[in-house]
Regions:
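Beta-rich carbohydrate-recognition and catalytic domains
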Residues: 1-21, 27-80, 89-228, 237-297
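Catalytic cores of histone-lysine modification enzymes
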Residues: 233
Length: 298
């Protein structure tokens, strides 16, 4: 059994207007001996999210924290929030992925930086078609039955014309046969998309991709702890035995949704080949501050 030490809370909301409601869902990367943390900062009132930033020392102590957001919503597709950041360093560039939320649609967007200070936004890279359109494409793959449930959930909750929801995106910190490998999450599983350039990720690319979706599934829910859905967590870590993927597993229980942390080991040359995955969670909500919050049982 894997033992995980709970280090407690390291970052909390402040009285600053951009993060006075909550701070959550961070991503970290080490550079020049410093751990850089980018996190979702939520403000009170309209609950719009921006991206906050701080630095952490080896002991887990905050040594520097901005008193203003590093990145803010600027475009219509992100007007209700920039959420769930992930940062990856590859070939001299920091790739920064996030979910752009416009009040209805949740779509993958990205930015780039060379210094983790100045970022250039490049816009949406995920598919922009409705669940009705996606269903027609899923019919041509073997993925329809597993993915159809969430079509009805989101259409009922958000609206008939909602786009295919995308979250939890990042690239592997290494190319495969010269191609980027983008991990993303169309409910309920985790998938990967390969491409030479981000400019390829257009409507034509995604329509062909979803017609063959079953070829690109890394993980689908399998065990009781992930009975509802799963989604990518930290950027994969390359080991001698394969890629270590930490992901969140959502259990449907009589108490509602429970978010667990889990892990899988993926083939170093083909991440759709799963070497092994945990049946029991790495860790689960135990402390009161994990069971009660802006989202419970996380």
């Amino acid at each position: 059994m894997v033992q995980v030490k709970n280090e407690g809370i390291i970052l909390q909301a402040t009285n600053l207007p951009f993060e006075n409601e909550a701070v959550l869902n961070p991503t970290c990367i080490e550079a020049n001996g410093i751990t850089h943390m980018f996190y979702r900062a939520v403000r009170k009132g309209d609950f719009v999210s921006s991206i906050g930033y701080c630095q952490i020392d080896e002991g887990g102590k905050i040594i520097n924290r901005l008193d203003h957001p590093l990145l803010i919503p600027e475009y219509d597709f992100e007007k209700e929030g920039m959420e769930d950041p992930r940062v990856v360093f590859l070939d001299g560039i920091y790739y920064f992925f996030y979910t752009g939320y416009d009040g209805k649609n949740a779509l993958i967007a990205y930015a780039t930086s060379k210094d983790l200070v100045h970022f250039e936004k490049h816009g949406i890279i995920s598919a922009q078609f409705t669940y009705d359109e996606a269903e027609d494409l899923f019919r041509q793959s073997k993925a329809l039955e597993k993915y159809q449930f969430f079509e009805s959930v989101l259409k009922d909750r958000v609206g008939e014309d909602v786009f295919l929801w995308e979250k939890d995106a990042f690239i592997f910190p290494k190319k495969f046969n010269g191609k980027f490998a983008l991990v993303h999450r169309v409910l309920p599983g985790i998938q990967v998309a390969y491409f030479n350039s981000f400019s390829e990720l257009n409507d034509s690319y995604w329509r062909k991709y979803f017609m063959e979706l079953d070829k690109y599934i890394i993980l689908d829910p399998k065990y009781e702890i992930e009975s509802r859905n799963i989604g990518g967590g930290a950027v994969p870590i390359e080991t001698e035995d394969g890629w270590l993927l930490i992901y969140h597993a959502v259990e449907d229980s009589k108490y509602g949704k429970i978010y667990h942390a889990s892990a899988a080991l993926l083939n170093r040359d083909d991440p759709t080949q799963v070497i092994g995955r945990l049946r029991a969670p790495l860790f689960s909500p135990k402390e009161e501050w994990e069971k009660k919050g802006k989202v419970n049982n996380v």
